[in-house]
Amino acid sequence: MACRCTQLQDTIDEVATQFYSSIHYLSSHHDFVPLPGQEKVSDSKVNPISAEELQFAQRDLAKDLVTKFMQIDTLINQLPGISTAPKHQLEKIKKLQNSIEEKQLERKSLESENEDLKLQLAKRIETFGRLSCVLFQP
């Protein structure tokens, strides 16, 4: 599962797409209303639907947008640290920094131990090579 920030960004992208799609749908399916004293105009790119269908579509699109915004709100509330006071967040950061420093020291110690073991192994291989040359010489 993706992290909360990624989910939030994906949901924001989805709501932006929904906004665009809603505006495009409504602008291509509305009916033209003439201004007083003018004739009703038309556009070949617009395929008008009835007023009832348009209202239903508007409500449906609005519900979808509200649902998406509720998902965004839920994701924001689930972000780490949202319900934590800044003081507690700083304490947690300090603990994590100390933990990182301890792990770095442990890593250096283990790297040093690893180098020592490599040297010991190299010496033993060298000793074994000399002994096998002496023992198996004709």
From Swiss-Prot:
- Keyword Transcription regulation attached: yes
List, alphabetically, the InterPro entries matched. Answer: Med7/Med21-like, Mediator_Med21
Parts of the chain that traverse the membrane? none
Q: Could you mention a single GO BP entry for this protein?
A: positive regulation of transcription initiation by RNA polymerase II
Family matches, as Pfam families: Med21 (PF11221)
Q: Which UniProt keywords apply?
A: Activator, Coiled coil, Nucleus, Transcription, Transcription regulation
Q: Where in the cell is it found?
A: Nucleus
**Positions in coiled-coil regions:** 87-128
Q: Name one GO cellular component term.
A: mediator complex
Query: Molecular function terms in GO for this entry?
Result: transcription coactivator activity; transcription coregulator activity
Keyword set includes Nucleus: yes
User: Which PANTHER family does the UniProt record give?
Assistant: MEDIATOR OF RNA POLYMERASE II TRANSCRIPTION SUBUNIT 21, RNA POLYMERASE II HOLOENZYME COMPONENT SRB7
Q: How does the record describe its quaternary structure?
A: Component of the Mediator complex.
What function does the entry list?
A: Component of the Mediator complex, a coactivator involved in the regulated transcription of nearly all RNA polymerase II-dependent genes. Mediator functions as a bridge to convey information from gene-specific regulatory proteins to the basal RNA polymerase II transcription machinery. Mediator is recruited to promoters by direct interactions with regulatory proteins and serves as a scaffold for the assembly of a functional preinitiation complex with RNA polymerase II and the general transcription factors.
What family does the entry list?
A: Belongs to the Mediator complex subunit 21 family.
Recorded protein name is Mediator of RNA polymerase II transcription subunit 21
Q: Which organism is it from?
A: Schizosaccharomyces pombe (strain 972 / ATCC 24843) (Fission yeast)
